[in-house]
Amino acid sequence: MIFKIEDVTVYFPYDNIYPEQYEYMVELKRALDAKGHCLLEMPTGTGKTIALLSLITSYRLSRPDSPIKLVYCTRTVHEMEKTLGELKLLHDYQVRHLGTQAKILALGLSSRKNLCVNTKVLAAENRDSVDAACRKRTASWVRALSTENPNVELCDFFENYEKAAENALLPPGVYTLEDLRAFGKNRGWCPYFLARHMIQFANVIVYSYQYLLDPKVAGFISKELQKESVVVFDEAHNIDNVCIEALSVSVRRVTLEGANRNLNKIRQEIDRFKATDAGRLRAEYNRLVEGLALRGDLSGGDQWLANPALPHDILKEAVPGNIRRAEHFVHVLRRLLQYLGVRLDTENVEKESPVSFVSSLNSQAGIEQKTLKFCYDRLQSLMLTLEITDTDEFLPIQTVCDFATLVGTYARGFSIIIEPYDERMPHIPDPILQLSCHDASLAIKPVFDRFQSVVITSGTLSPIDLYPRLLNFTPVVSRSFKMSMTRDCICPMVLTRGSDQLPVSTKFDMRSDPGVVRNYGKLLVEMVSIVPDGVVCFFVSYSYMDGIIATWNETGILKEIMQQKLVFIETQDVVETTLALDNYRRACDCGRGAVFFSVARGKVAEGIDFDRHYGRLVVMYGVPFQYTLSKILRARLEYLHDTFQIKEGDFLTFDALRQAAQCVGRVIRSKADYGMMIFADKRYSRHDKRSKLPGWILSHLRDAHLNLSTDMAIHIAREFLRKMAQPYDKAGTMGRKTLLTQEDLEKMAETGVQDMAY
């Protein structure tokens, strides 16, 4: 359908549109017109992605004089592929109606591991090894050496791409990762470097958050992006955590041991170069004296991760004299490693500010703050000079230089925390030194400052007023949408007690109570006997899940569950979990039914959909608070209170409830779908807790469903399933119109009414 929103003609590839999609587009257009940033919470399963893509691409077509670029950030490769699939459909529709003027270039960008087509490189076991294997075949010095020694192995795809030079271009179209690989194989060009090259010409780019938020990656991937770009962070409920992780570094004993080995190897290489090619080291020294850290623009194969500090915090001056000579720099790093080793050798938890840490480092190891700031750039320069390609082997020394650069650059918003062991396993010595960032606004500020509009959107952004405070920005539009429905296809319930009327909760003093564990088990036994197909259970942590499953196994509860449905469990091993998910789906497909045990904040809670028969019921056991005794969390809470006046309890509740909402939202992925949500903890019945759930869940949470026992929940579930068994009328009856036609939109435009009756 084609319709107008004010002066923009919107091309939408479906015959009908949901009222909330239309409203979403109206609010998004307001933000684009104002050239400002916005926060939009849209219920899951209501076509948020296609609404966003339709409006922004149509907005671009309506402003041919000032075309905008869309940068769409997703959390996972699966979401990236899904977004590009939707964009393909939309692009075909627009080209059908507008011809060649609607043609765009859109592509996804991911790591070498996901884009490489060289089978020998792909044989490496992990992402870092794939990067190193690629570098061994594409570095400029390796390619130069191959002219003298034909036995040196190069990458044919990269060589062909380099030979094509300016002609290595992608024709207009929408390219998924699979399309890029196929195109690369067909032309004999490297898809990874081709995609990197095409970013500057593309109208739409879809990639991971890190490509914009992590300075190390953004520094060489996204630095050329124009200001007239609209940046979208999809599924952005955890964006503050992504920002914090981008600027945090952890150092363990194993890191220091690896870094020492790296320095030994670097020292050997320096000695070898002194004997065979001393001029190269001299040239590097002269370059550093002149203040040129790197040799101009590096070719693709030579590029390294950028500086870990944010662009405006990097010093634009010459490297300090005491680390210009390679051997002097190695000596400084040795002293730094010795100092870190001494600090890790402690029996007490220590917490201090970067200023205090740098002062102590200066007095005990003689390393100044300015020297620390340049550690990462100096290491990068040295490794290029020494022509080192085994980048995966040198990760430990890179981590230490990351740490040094960040601790030397930032005085506020960070803490250094040294813990001799994990508090949850105090009998195992495992010292860790963490430079922890507490201020999410630091990493995202360059994005807000640089780009015209930033859209933060998700199904879970409640309470929506907390995000501007956490990220320190002022949105021009901030809106939470409700879900229009022809039938009440979601049924949230709060279970506060078992059939024996004992209260249930995962509060620390109650979670191990045999009565609570028994009631949680009995709830599931009763539910699996009446709910068809798939049931998903989320626990607050891996340790709690392991403990409760072990108890259920001993008491025979697990056996009772398995008489009704097969049981699959998420583990911390990605391969095991993927296999368990695959078998869970097969059990649901063949009618046997299955239960999947998972963990809030785990991989499954964040990125796997349990739509249709894969998830007819989700049980959230407990309130998924973070581990509140964590020293890093305590330091962050202190910082948030002092800087943004966010109370400790408010933040902890907000964080726990967004995770709970994310877990239960996994079961509804469209309006034709249906599912039940059970919040099994007495704390959810308190207004201060449940009020922080998204509006689209709260609007279906009736007062009669707030303080249930197991037998009451069973009765409600039976009634709900009976209702859902009736034929589904997707057009809407009884005045609850949830699909708008083109005529409806035209009428609304005439009357000026934008809010339809839900």
Swiss-Prot record:
- Chain ranges of the Helicase ATP-binding domain: 7-285
Q: What Pfam family does this protein match (any one)?
A: HBB
State how changing G521E affects the protein, per the record: In uvh6-1; confers increased sensitivity to UV light and heat, yellow-green leaf coloration, and mild growth defects
The entry marks the following residues as binding [4Fe-4S] cluster, namely: C116, C134, C155, C190
Q: Which residue ranges does the UniProt annotation give for the motif DEAH box?
A: 234-238
Question: Under which EC number(s) is this enzyme classified?
Answer: 5.6.2.3
Name the domain of life this protein comes from.
Eukaryota
Mention any one GO cellular component term assigned to this protein in its UniProt record. Answer: nucleus
Per UniProt, the keywords (alphabetical) are: 4Fe-4S, ATP-binding, DNA damage, DNA repair, DNA-binding, Helicase, Hydrolase, Iron, Iron-sulfur, Isomerase, Metal-binding, Nucleotide-binding, Nucleus, Transcription, Transcription regulation
Reaction equation(s) it catalyzes: Couples ATP hydrolysis with the unwinding of duplex DNA at the replication fork by translocating in the 5'-3' direction. This creates two antiparallel DNA single strands (ssDNA). The leading ssDNA polymer is the template for DNA polymerase III holoenzyme which synthesizes a continuous strand; ATP + H2O = ADP + phosphate + H(+)
Indicate where this protein is primarily found. Answer: nucleus
Keyword Electron transport appears in the UniProt entry: no
- Give binding positions for ATP: M42, P43, T44, G45, T46, G47, K48, T49
Cite the GO molecular-function annotations of the record: 4 iron, 4 sulfur cluster binding; ATP binding; ATP hydrolysis activity; DNA binding; DNA helicase activity; metal ion binding
Q: Where in the cell is it found?
A: Nucleus
What is the tissue localization of expression for this protein?
A: Expressed at low levels in all tissues.
According to the record, cofactor stoichiometry and binding are noted as: Binds 1 [4Fe-4S] cluster.
Q: Which family, according to UniProt?
A: Belongs to the helicase family. RAD3/XPD subfamily.
In terms of PANTHER family, this protein maps to: DNA REPAIR DEAD HELICASE RAD3/XP-D SUBFAMILY MEMBER, GENERAL TRANSCRIPTION AND DNA REPAIR FACTOR IIH HELICASE SUBUNIT XPD
Purpose: ATP-dependent 5'-3' DNA helicase, component of the general transcription and DNA repair factor IIH (TFIIH) core complex, which is involved in general and transcription-coupled nucleotide excision repair (NER) of damaged DNA and, when complexed to CDK-activating kinase (CAK), involved in transcription by RNA polymerase II. In NER, TFIIH acts by opening DNA around the lesion to allow the excision of the damaged oligonucleotide and its replacement by a new DNA fragment. The ATP-dependent helicase activity of XPD is required for DNA opening.
Assembly state and interactors?
Answer: Component of the 7-subunit TFIIH core complex composed of XPB, XPD, TFB1/GTF2H1, GTF2H2/P44, TFB4/GTF2H3, TFB2/GTF2H4 and TFB5/GTF2H5, which is active in NER. The core complex associates with the 3-subunit CDK-activating kinase (CAK) module composed of CYCH1/cyclin H1, CDKD and MAT1/At4g30820 to form the 10-subunit holoenzyme (holo-TFIIH) active in transcription. Interacts with GTF2H2/p44.
Protein name, UniProt field: General transcription and DNA repair factor IIH helicase subunit XPD
- Organism of origin: Arabidopsis thaliana (Mouse-ear cress)
Gene symbol of the encoding locus: XPD
